[in-house]
């Protein structure tokens, strides 16, 4: 809670005599630290596995019982982790499926416990997360009976998509196709309707190599028709003036991830939207892929993110912070701290 401001009458009078008046009050308000909102502590299910964190043993034990291991990275106060537990795992059929087919092992993104990877390498929790390039929480890694990652979810996805992920990764599923094709077969993307529009989207035809030549970063929004998550992104995040300002340094384009729309990639390749999405491994709608002014992919959003995290993604690339700080979570912390130091409240769940 913000400290109660006290402005003594004599100081107020002195400010007015000095010609400061209202600006003096405004300066004092700006000196206060803003609040950090939206953090929520999560009680993780008691049926998560209590592991010695030697993953080769965990994989073997799970395989012996006809299950697979899921490594679940979380962090303290993470509202997206809380959503996974309270919105997804709270649904009886999802909980039953998870418990029947998987041993879930929770790791703290910033934790110091000792872990041993499947190949025998020792790490702390946080170093293991860094080695795996975990940039978001929750991140879930589904391991097969040999310890190979068969599916990775980077961030929170809604219950329907989450359950499809469980079906794909469960023991014995043997889908015979990649997860992208599996999702397409399960969800049957609509061929009718239209994509959500936004004022910052460039009109086709798209030659993204031109943007790179002009030294401008590129933001590619892969979406689909009849997409509730896309609707939510546009309504609650992309329509916000601060989000629009954060996107303004970018050449932003919107692509139907299943369409045959022709384009030229930042690297100069002529391809269709569908073909490029497949090359990039885009599976979730909406996915936002951010490219530097050099044409290299820096980071992507392929899960549900609200305003603060979405705006931070664009700031991370446009401001060049990724060149000095490879850990996006640390960048988030630094950005929130800087905003609060200027007196702004930061709500990470808005």
Where are these regions (language model features)?
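A fold-wide structural signal in alpha/beta-hydrolase
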Residues: 103-105, 251-253
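Bacterial N-terminal signal peptides that target proteins for export
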Residues: 2-11
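Active-site-proximal cofactor/substrate-binding loop regions of enzyme domains
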Residues: 98
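Proteins that catalyze or organize thiol-disulfide redox chemistry
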Residues: 25-69, 76-92, 109-135, 139-218, ...
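C-terminal segment of classical bacterial N-terminal signal peptides
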Residues: 16-23
């Amino acid at each position: 809670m913000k400290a109660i401001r006290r402005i003594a009458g004599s100081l107020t009078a002195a400010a007015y005599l000095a010609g400061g008046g209202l600006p003096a009050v405004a300066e004092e308000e700006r000196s206060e630290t803003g609040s950090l909102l939206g953090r929520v502590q999560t009680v993780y299910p008691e049926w998560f596995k209590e592991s010695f964190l030697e993953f080769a043993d965990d994989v073997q034990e799970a395989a012996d019982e006809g299950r697979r291991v899921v490594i679940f990275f979380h962090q303290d106060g993470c509202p997206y982790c809380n959503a996974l537990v309270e919105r997804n795992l709270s649904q009886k059929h999802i909980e039953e499926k998870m418990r029947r087919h998987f041993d879930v092992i929770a790791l703290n993104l910033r934790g110091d416990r000792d872990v041993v990877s499947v190949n025998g390498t020792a790490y702390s929790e946080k170093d293991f997360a860094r080695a795996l390039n975990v940039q978001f929480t929750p991140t879930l890694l589904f391991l097969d009976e040999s310890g190979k990652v068969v599916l990775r979810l980077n961030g929170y996805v809604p219950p329907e998509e989450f359950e499809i992920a469980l079906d794909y990764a469960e023991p014995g599923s043997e889908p015979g196709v990649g997860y992208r094709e599996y999702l397409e077969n399960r969800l049957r993307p609509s061929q009718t309707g239209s994509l959500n529009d936004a004022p910052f989207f460039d009109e086709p035809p798209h030659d993204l190599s031109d943007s790179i030549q002009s030294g401008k970063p590129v933001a590619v929004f892969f979406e689909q028709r009849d997409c509730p998550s896309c609707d939510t992104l546009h309504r609650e995040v992309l329509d916000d003036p601060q989000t629009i300002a954060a996107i303004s340094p970018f050449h932003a384009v919107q692509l139907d991830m299943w369409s045959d729309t022709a384009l030229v990639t930042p690297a100069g390749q002529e391809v269709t939207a569908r073909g490029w999405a497949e090359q990039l491994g885009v599976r979730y709608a909406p996915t936002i892929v951010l490219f530097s002014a050099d044409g290299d992919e820096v980071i992507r959003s392929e899960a549900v993110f609200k305003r603060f995290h979405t705006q931070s993604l664009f700031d991370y690339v446009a401001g060049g912070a990724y060149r000095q700080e490879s850990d996006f979570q640390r960048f988030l912390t630094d950005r929130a701290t800087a905003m609060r130091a200027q007196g702004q409240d930061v709500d990470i769940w808005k």
